A protein has these predicted regions:
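P-loop NTPase motor domains
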Residues: 46-47, 53-72, 79-83, 248, ...
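A short helix-turn-beta junction within AAA+ P-loop NTPase domains corresponding to the substrate/partner-engaging
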Residues: 481-485, 713-726
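Conserved lysine of the Walker
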Residues: 445
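Extended, folded cores of ATP/NTP-driven motor/assembly subunits in large transport
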Residues: 1-401
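Hydrophobic anchor at the beta1->P-loop junction of P-loop NTPases
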Residues: 437
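Hydrophobic positions on the alpha1 helix immediately C-terminal to the Walker A/P-loop
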Residues: 448
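Conserved P-loop NTPase
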Residues: 741-793
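Post-Walker A helix-loop "phosphate-sensing" segment adjacent to the P-loop in P-loop NTPases
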Residues: 455-465, 480-482
Length: 793
């Protein structure tokens, strides 16, 4: 930042003259004066306000170290830009385009719902944060090398604090300046550096407004926009980190800038000692006056005594603690469409400051200098500074509430309970997109699951598979023209557990992906592993004992016999092996192999007995985009085997889709039931670990958190889940969840006696409280509701 006394600036005659930089280069370096250069970094919010006290203290300490990392040759500007954007343009981010199918009426209704939710929050107000650092250098080359070193340090410091940050290039810096100075126009910024050479114009010509008017002493006009720059007068004896947060919560156009100039420690100590010496002289003079006047010489004016104590304390902090001194200029720029609205916004802003015993003062006859200091260029010509220590400066922690609003195939998860902003995230962007949806009965768990399924169906081409133990998903599945497969002993829907993907045989080249090869050998190996797990379930050994070596070997031998004969002899779907083939092969070896006889005896019930539902070739459309396995009527005898078979069918589908570069989403309700048995638990763990690599996204849904957390598999499941939607929880489960997921008491309060559709969203390292109040007067609500009087059949 360039101080006013160093400026010999001619009076500006054009709007471009008011914008005080010489040049902004392609790499983002800005030359503000002959010897001053700056760079700019955008950083993103973290959940400081929601963090545990220990985490808050760590962030604060790291931020203090960050401020102390700047020496007196680097001047810093921290910018908070809250800017209203055109709602219609912003709404395009969530618009769901029509497609050539029969679901456009649902798309329109869902899209309208999103726009309605968008209007509830302040998502039309885009909040961004930047840091600009400036240095003095003889030339661009010297400036560039040093600015890049500072930039690397800045990025690393933000990483330590857990905040994402990225440097801005020249076009990005110009766009920010354009948007700040052209709030009255809906025109987007279109610029590339080739336009400078083609048009003969300068970069300022592409960002300048139609004009500036600084004739009034307390406000200005920028195009058709009215603006006012004020400064924060810090009069409170003790500051709080909530002051800045409350100012940034103001749902109006607002630009806050903190200009920081570190003071050299030696110079600061020398200055303070000099000041202390002057105070001592003043004390001596006062004591002499007291003696001459005949009263006690120890009685001196309170202000001198207090001033001396303050200076001594400040000197002690610098000498004995890791404190620096900074010259701080805290500026606020409000803008509005008209003067009356501007005055109201300034009044609102002042009210927030007064709540914390501080004042907002308009810059009188300095509005132009205030505007320049409000642009992220690193220039401060106001001449208004306040000396602050590192700790007192760091109380303006630049973090408040993290938002999650992504574009592309992002899905809706409600509104941020702290800011009321729309939450839109894409699980595919996570390292491990597997997830959990946890909640007590009535918490909105099933509704949240169905809402995600519907959202996935409407905006992606992902395949969707559901395991439905309660038979509650069929209204939604039917509405999406999906396939509901009822699995029970009396059902006429059949799925063949011996079925394999013949496409591997017909088109082997499709299954060579990233060094992985799927061929006949891998098909047989995978099927042998599955049949082994299946036999472990049906043989019901005491204390869930595993199969012995002879039994495992016999299964492997029989499976190889069956599939080598089938796959190497022009395989056809109508000749697909069934459990009957496996049973017959076991009986072939049974006379000489007791292990084969044992397995065959256990298998007989499922082949020729009353539970032979799985001894048929498939007669349902397992290739439908939406498939729901309804296992509600699956009896106790078949339930474990049935759930294992469903898992295997899902894995086969994931394998097929991988070759098509297509994602598969698998939703498992009552997920804790799978973890009760070693076979299904092990299979689940394997899926959780391998799904991502194969293009699968698995979601476990559970209302019985106690059983889920008590499973030995929970560590592997949670460790491979970067997405958790946590709704209301029983008090006993809250403590366990807080320990497992390392969340604070304040965070856990959002799932304590919370209403339906409210809770915590875990997305990677981000934790956000959410609330979803889905409009009930819609067709989609009726499809997703699980309330008895609202269920649509």
């Amino acid at each position: 930042m360039i101080k006013a006394e160093n400026q010999k600036k001619r009076k500006p005659f054009t709007a471009q003259d008011t914008i005080p930089y010489k040049e902004i280069y392609k790499d983002g370096i800005c030359r503000t004066d002959d010897n001053y250069y700056s760079k700019m970094v955008q950083f993103y919010d973290i959940n400081y306000q929601l963090a545990q006290n220990d985490d808050k203290a760590a962030i604060f300490e790291n931020y203090c170290e960050f401020l102390n990392s700047f020496d007196s040759s680097v001047e810093v500007q921290i910018t908070f830009l809250n800017q209203q954007v055109n709602f219609d343009e912003y709404a395009k981010n969530i618009d769901i385009p029509e497609q050539d199918d029969c679901f456009n009426d649902i798309r329109k209704e869902y899209s309208d719902m999103l726009k309605m939710q968008l209007s509830k929050g302040n998502n039309g107000l885009v909040k961004t944060k930047y840091i600009t650092f400036s240095i003095k250098a003889d030339n661009l080359r010297n400036a560039k090398s040093r600015l890049e070193r500072i930039e690397a340090s800045v990025l690393n410091n933000f990483k330590v604090m857990g905040a994402m940050a990225e440097p801005l290039n020249g076009v990005e810096r110009l766009k920010i300046l354009h948007d700040v100075m052209n709030m009255d126009t809906k025109e987007s910024f279109h610029f590339h550096y080739g336009m400078v050479a083609k048009t003969g114009l300068q970069t300022k010509d592409f960002i300048a407004p139609t004009g500036f008017d600084f004739r009034n002493d307390s406000y200005f006009r920028m195009g058709q926009t009215f603006g006012c720059v004020s400064y924060l007068q810090i009069t409170s004896p003790e500051l709080t980190d909530k002051l800045l947060a409350d100012l940034l919560d103001l749902e109006e156009n607002l630009i806050i800038n903190m200009h920081l100039r570190p003071i050299d420690p030696k110079a600061a100590i020398k200055s303070l000692k000099s000041t202390l010496s002057n105070i001592q002289k003043m004390k001596i003079e006062e004591q002499k006056k007291a003696v001459r006047s005949g009263y006690d010489m120890d009685i001196i004016p309170t202000d001198i005594s207090t001033y001396g104590e303050d200076v001594e304390g400040l000197l002690n902090e610098i000498q004995s603690r890791n404190e620096k001194l900074f010259e701080l200029t805290f500026l606020l720029m409000n803008t509005a469409d008209n003067k009356r609205k501007l005055d109201n916004i300034v009044y609102q802003t002042a009210g927030i400051a007064q709540k914390y015993n501080c004042n907002i003062r308009r810059l009188q006859y300095q509005q132009e200098q205030g505007l320049v200091a409000s642009l992220p260029l690193g220039m401060n010509q106001t001449g208004i500074q306040r000396i602050m220590t590192t700790t007192s400066t760091a109380i303006f922690v630049p973090f408040t509430t993290q938002e999650l609003f992504q574009g592309g195939e992002a899905l809706y998860y409600g509104l941020n309970a702290l800011s009321n902003n729309l939450i839109m995230v894409d699980r595919k962007r996570l390292k491990t997109p597997n997830g959990l949806i946890l909640g007590t009965p009535g918490s909105g768990k099933s509704f949240a699951t169905k809402r995600e399924i519907l959202n996935v169906f409407l905006i992606t081409d992902d395949d969707i598979i559901l395991c439905d133990p309660e038979g509650e998903y069929f209204p939604l599945v039917n509405a999406l023209n999906g396939e509901v497969i009822k699995i029970s002993a009396k059902s006429n829907d059949y799925i063949n557990p011996m079925e394999v993907n013949l496409d591997v045989i017909y088109h082997p080249e499709k299954y060579r992906i990233n060094g992985d090869v799927e061929d006949i050998d891998t098909i047989i190996a995978d099927k042998a592993e599955f049949i082994t797990s299946f036999c472990e379930v049906i043989m019901k050994k005491p204390q869930n004992a595993e199969l012995n070596g002879d039994e495992v070997s016999m299964i492997d031998l029989c499976v190889k016999d069956i599939y080598k004969k089938y796959l190497y002899n022009d395989p056809k779907p109508e000749n697909m092996p069934t459990l009957q083939d496996f049973y017959e092969r076991l009986n072939f070896y049974a006379p000489d192999k007791p292990a084969a006889q044992n397995i065959a005896n256990s298998l007989q019930l499922y082949v020729t007995g009353s539970q032979n539902v799985f001894n048929h070739r498939s007669n349902v459309d397992t290739q439908n985009r939406v498939v729901c396995f309804d296992i509600r009527e699956l009896g106790t005898t078949l339930r474990k085997a049935g759930m294992l078979i469903v898992q295997h069918m899902v894995w086969t589908r994931v394998s097929q889709n991988r070759s098509r570069r297509k994602s598969t989403r698998y939703y498992v309700d009552e997920f804790h039931l799978l973890l009760n048995q070693p076979q299904t638990a092990n299979y689940s763990i394997e899926m959780w670990k391998r799904f991502r690599k194969w293009g699968g996204i698995i979601t476990g849904i559970s209302q019985n958190v106690t059983d889920f957390l008590g499973s030995l598999a929970v560590e592997s499941i949670v460790g491979n889940s970067d997405f958790i939607l946590m709704l209301n929880q029983h008090s006993g489960d809250q403590k366990i969840l807080a320990e497992k997921l390392n969340i604070s008491k304040h965070q856990i309060s959002f799932v304590n006696n919370s209403n339906a559709g409210e809770g915590l969203l875990f997305y990677g390292n981000v934790i956000i409280p959410f609330a979803d109040r889905y409009p009930q007067d819609t067709r989609t609500y009726a499809l997703m509701s699980t309330k008895p009087d609202e269920i649509q059949t």
